[in-house]
């Protein structure tokens, strides 16, 4: 979306999407009188991972890649703008979020988010949150938070680094029934801690490729003041009476129970 300013067209691929991917969507540039090349800024955010089901870790944020501003997801430098040609179709894939894990005797971890693609730019889906009985979290654009058991601190998932870093790792679960927070675009998820307190999710990245008014209209990102944040990590589950918060950038909060599983 957006308009050309000084021969720069801004394209945003992020927001709230259905669970199923939007595949084979075409971006067509036509009816334009241009002097090649047309350079575009972009923000591509993948689907976030699903949180773990039973004393689970938070889902990791989907990977975030952008050419706008000074940094991209994971703290790397902003990426190179793309060059597009009028009259050419460019395929888009909008990745869906991963499913949350199942609670109960047959508890499961969440599932990974799916990738988002714009032209040659691919952002990796977020890692899943760990859960009883397998508390290890999954890797992704940002890693999922580790789950918890009575004997094991479930390790958080790693953030992918290839082809570029896109987010941060998930926090570790704590054996006293506290899941780790999912990683966000700028900070890692927090570890679960004693007292059965789940870890908070990692923070997303402020990218004002759209101003706050346009982002609100388009239902993308999370607004804070005049800034728009993307790709926060989910909060981890605890066994106390307060839910761990998700990181700024549209993430969900962790759940809680009144005691251990």
What is the meaning of each model-derived region?
Residues 7-9, 25, 30-32:
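The right-handed parallel beta-helix/beta-solenoid scaffold, focusing on the short coil/turn
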